[in-house]
UniProtKB/Swiss-Prot annotation:
Organism taxonomic ancestry: Bacteria, Bacillati, Bacillota, Clostridia, Eubacteriales
Name the record gives this protein: Acetate kinase 1
Annotated gene: ackA1
Native organism: Clostridium perfringens (strain 13 / Type A)
Location of the protein in the cell: Cytoplasm
Pfam families hit by this protein: Acetate_kinase (PF00871)
Record-listed substrate binding positions: R91
């Protein structure tokens, strides 16, 4: 069984074809600059060999048509017919309050996703365009929506309700939603499997640390809290996002500094985080390199990042009544031994002892705690596309 995964952005489309018989990637690619100059398709096969097609691509429907034709192309394709694709799994950013799990797409689902677009104006409209395009080009294929927010649908009210006028929640659905849910779900299940434990018996903290970053508390297989909120801006500092700040800073910027609301949003989303603090880059590799050369602001950016992660881990341990395993994933979490060491140092009093030799691992599944550590720590490479494929297979029941 082969599942096609589609992830549509406003001017891009990522895709991956997965063979569910062995859960291996067959091929993956991206269509870039849709509707813009210099649009192109870049595809990589399982040997990481590249195929590049440069041509005008005016919209997402044309992009998906090109993807499908490339998949069956005699020279660079990997299947003989589109009939070999069993179903399509779509990454959808926001499922609102209604969808706390993945769902087979129909008109009612699409209508609700359109209503949710006000909650994710940069993402949901593009996701819907991709769904419509696939339905038009593959009318007989079942389509499944897998939501970034869904895994956090188990948050209790005390975790997701903000301490603001309750009418703002009732009338406008302003609450914590959380994001990166597909990643948090995948790595939590993967670490339980690796440990040979039933996830229902575990208390897990998952740290998805990349240019976007979030941390989740997972108890008995259900997410009970997460750091991102109404939007992906909330939580810990990230590459360019501020994370949590005092809300009064916003009117201060408008009234005293002359910012427009658009400029405030631009600053907090694209000019803050470790980029804003360091003045160096939003790439943690560049910041670590600068810090190693005694750049004080770069070191400060890292110190704040690590401090805020530790604060959230501590909070989640208290609210879960303990923790069995802490997981690091995504670009920084998987590839920065320095970040992991700083986040886990001096935790022997809790029963967690890091193995510095094991912690040198990059990008591979590995335990990084000492053998006798009561609390375990792992690096688990995320695989959101495989999680989407698994959810798709589960729903279509084939």
């Amino acid at each position: 069984m082969k599942i096609l995964i589609i992830n549509c952005g406003s001017s891009s489309l990522k895709y991956k074809l997965i063979d569910m018989a062995n859960e291996k990637d067959i091929i993956e690619g991206i269509v870039e600059r849709i509707g813009l100059d210099q649009s192109r398709l870049v595809q990589k096969n399982e040997l990481r060999e590249k195929y590049i097609l440069e041509k005008e691509i005016k919209d997402h429907k044309e992009a998906i048509d090109i993807v499908l034709n490339t998949l069956v192309d005699p020279k660079v394709g990997v299947i003989e017919s589109i009939d070999e694709i069993t179903a399509v799994g779509h990454r959808v950013v926001h499922g609102g309050e209604r969808y706390s799990s993945s769902i087979i797409i129909n008109e009612e689902v699409i209508k609700y996703l359109e209503e949710c677009s006000k909650l994710a104006p940069l993402h949901n409209p593009a996701n819907i365009i991709g769904i419509r395009a696939c339905q038009s080009l593959m009318p007989n294929k079942e389509m499944v929506a897998v939501f970034d927010t869904a895994f956090h649908g188990t948050l209790p009210e005390k975790a997701y309700i903000y301490a603001i006028d309750y009418a703002l929640y009732k009338d406008h659905k302003i609450r914590k939603y959380g994001f990166h849910g597909t990643s948090h779900k995948y790595v939590s299940h993967k670490v339980a499997e690796t440990m040979g434990k039933d996830i229902k018996d575990l208390k897990i903290i998952t740290c998805h640390l990349g240019n976007g970053a979030s941390i989740s508390a997972i108890k008995g297989g259900e997410c009970i809290d997460t750091t991102m909120g109404f939007t992906p801006l909330a939580g810990i500092p990230m590459g360019t996002r501020s994370g949590n700040i005092d809300p009064s800073i916003i009117p201060f910027l408008v009234e005293e500094c002359g910012y427009t609301i658009e400029e405030v949003s631009e600053s907090l989303n694209k000019k803050s985080g470790v980029l804003g603090i360091s003045g160096v880059s939003s790439d943690f590799r560049d910041i670590e390199d600068a810090a190693s050369k005694v750049d004080k602001r770069a070191q400060l950016a890292l110190d704040i990042f690590h401090y805020r992660i530790r604060a959230e881990i501590g909070s989640f341990i208290v609210n879960m009544g303990g923790v069995d395993v802490i997981v690091f994933t995504a670009g920084v979490g998987e590839n920065s031994p320095e970040t992991r060491e700083e986040c886990l140092k001096d935790l022997e009093f809790l029963g967690l002892t890091l193995d510095k030799e094991k912690n040198k691992v990059r990008g591979k599944l590995a335990e990084i705690s000492q053998a006798d550590s009561k609390i375990k720590a792992y690096v688990v490479p995320t695989n959101e596309e495989l999680m989407i494929a698994k959810e798709t297979v589960e729903l279509i029941g084939k």
